[in-house]
Swiss-Prot record:
The lineage of its organism: Bacteria, Pseudomonadati, Pseudomonadota, Gammaproteobacteria, Legionellales. This is tRNA-cytidine(32) 2-sulfurtransferase. The keyword Acetylation does not apply. Binds 1 [4Fe-4S] cluster per subunit. The cluster is chelated by three Cys residues, the fourth Fe has a free coordination site that may bind a sulfur atom transferred from the persulfide of IscS. HAMAP family: TtcA. It comes from Coxiella burnetii (strain CbuG_Q212).
Length: 256
């Protein structure tokens, strides 16, 4: 697939998500969380292109959190943002030391790291008056999270495309919800984003998400529709076919 075709495909699915879930309203100030990875770069790049088109009237701002990880170098990232003329701030908070201190060696850092990062993001967004917080989770993240929740937590839940935070103060959006990771990888390579690797968790193997990712990949080899079917299931709920008493009154179910 050519460079333009990949970009066109991704923009199509981002716009579909924006419209399906009314993610962005006229006049919104959207804070895009830029981690330095391929997903957040792609999100920021596509939203910036859509903003420049002019059909959606909103402002974007890139928020970068420097967590004081060894080897962190944001010089190329700064250059990329300056070149794109995107407003940004790089905030330094040493969550790295906290995570290393609290989590035993060999254990997964992701959960605590995410909680610390989320708190900083929410606080910054509130202080600066941003109306939306945009995250770079894509289609594969959504379907993997669903299966992880089922397998390891006994819950049917995932990452919704649009979410009101628990404290009711922030609206989170995931414009890449319909985008496939393989297309994002192609786009990131073509754009030559100056990626910053995560040295905190990048070396941890056999994480739950990687196992679920392999499972989905293996199933897709037998039936390519498996990933899209899982995604479609998230918006095709049949409460009467499940076992949740809060969603369906099974006790009072009788023949009239």
């Amino acid at each position: 697939m050519s460079e333009k075709r990949v970009e066109k495909k991704l923009i199509h699915y981002v716009k579909k998500a924006l419209n399906d879930y009314r993610m962005i309203n006229t006049g919104d100030r959207v804070m895009v969380c830029l981690s330095g990875g391929k997903d957040s770069y792609t999100l920021l790049s596509l939203l910036n292109s859509i903003r420049i088109e002019g059909n959606y009237k909103f402002d974007i701002f890139a928020f970068v959190l420097d967590q004081s990880q060894p080897g962190w170098d944001d010089s190329a990232l700064r250059g990329w943002l300056d070149d794109k003329k995107i407003s940004y701030e790089i905030l330094t908070r040493d969550t790295y030391s906290i995570v290393k201190e609290k989590i035993p060696a060999g254990k997964t850092y992701c959960s605590l790291c995410s909680r610390l990062r989320r708190g900083i993001i929410y606080r910054y967004a509130e202080e600066q008056g941003f109306s939306k917080i945009a995250l770079g989770h894509h289609r594969d993240d959504l379907i993997q999270t669903l299966l992880m929740s089922v397998f390891y937590n006994g819950q049917i839940r995932s990452m919704p495309p649009k979410l009101l935070s628990d404290n009711k103060r922030h609206v989170l959006i995931r414009p890449l919800a319909y985008c496939q990771e393989r297309d994002i990888i192609k786009y990131a390579m073509e754009q030559q984003f100056p990626l910053i690797p995560c040295n905190l968790c990048g070396s941890q193997k056999n994480l739950m998400r990687q196992r679920v990712k392999r499972l989905i990949s293996d199933l897709a080899k037998e039936n390519p529709k498996v990933p899209s079917n899982i995604l479609r299931a998230l918006s095709n709920i049949k409460p009467s076919q499940l076992m949740d008493h809060e969603l369906w009154n099974f006790r009072e179910l009788n023949v009239d």
